[in-house]
């Protein structure tokens, strides 16, 4: 399990972090989002990959059950992500999380991002949840980036309220990435290594993850399948309404 330590709740607006990365902070193109959504909802691909490297890889790490108060927003089960733009382990996790959430809804104002140019696995291509909005009739999602790409930001993000800070402080190990699945399970750290994305840009990754035999598909689709399974886990309403929850890989992962 890989966890990047955070010493304080430093909340940052990342949209201006373009040093060495012209695309960073700019909206993901509609054509790219459409293609990514097609990958996300390719059930044949998802079932073929299953959990992939998220279980068999060197950094295999699964969500752990907790006994929290059920987490909902407007009556919908809620998923919370906490990370930072500089963090390479958050970078690889965002690929899987975006794909998983696209199986239940869609994003607007999702932007391109790269991890820090000075950290390990420098400049890992990814996305940022800053200023993005998630739309779904059956699931709620909110993503917070605590620190910008240069690891020097200090702009307060008002969305990370005391409510979310308390959830993070209670159930996280103090690091990022952190994902809370409806307060039923939480994931501390990444499920796969960012190394699988090394040397590729966004379009190359998108092309590679369509082929179940590639290392990037085994990692990205594998983690997306893990995230999807834990969104569906122990949720009767979702299992009745969401096609993703009825896929064979979900049953294989959560039993």
Locate predicted features.
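Non-globular targeting/processing and membrane-anchoring segments
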Residues: 1-78, 92-94, 99-255
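Cell wall/extracellular polymer interaction/catalysis modules
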Residues: 89
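Short pre-active-site segment immediately N-terminal to redox-active cysteine/selenocysteine motifs
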Residues: 83-86
């Amino acid at each position: 399990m890989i966890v990047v330590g955070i010493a304080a709740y430093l909340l940052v607006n990342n949209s201006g972090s373009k040093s060495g990365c012209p695309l960073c902070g700019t909206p993901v193109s509609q054509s790219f989002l459409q293609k990514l959504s097609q990958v996300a909802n390719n059930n044949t691909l998802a079932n073929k990959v299953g959990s992939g490297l998220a279980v068999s890889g060197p950094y295999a790490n699964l969500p752990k059950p907790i006994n929290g108060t059920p987490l909902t927003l407007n009556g919908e089960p809620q998923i919370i992500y906490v990370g930072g733009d500089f963090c390479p382990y958050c970078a690889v996790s965002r690929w899987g999380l975006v794909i998983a959430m696209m199986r239940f809804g869609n994003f607007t104002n999702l932007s391109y991002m790269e991890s820090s140019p000075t950290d390990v696995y420098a400049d890992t291509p990814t996305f940022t949840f800053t200023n993005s909005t998630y739309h779904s009739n059956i699931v709620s999602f909110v993503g917070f980036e605590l620190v910008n790409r240069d690891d020097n930001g200090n702009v307060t993000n008002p969305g990370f309220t005391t409510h979310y800070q308390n959830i993070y402080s209670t159930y996280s190990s103090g690091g990022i990435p952190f994902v809370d699945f409806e307060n039923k399970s939480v994931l501390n750290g990444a499920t796969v290594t960012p190394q699988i994305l090394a040397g590729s840009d966004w379009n190359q990754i998108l092309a590679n993850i369509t082929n179940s035999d590639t290392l990037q598909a085994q990692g990205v689709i594998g983690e997306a399948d893990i995230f999807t399974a834990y969104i569906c886990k122990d949720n009767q309403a979702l299992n009745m309404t969401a096609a993703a929850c009825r896929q064979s890989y979900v049953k294989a992962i959560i039993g």
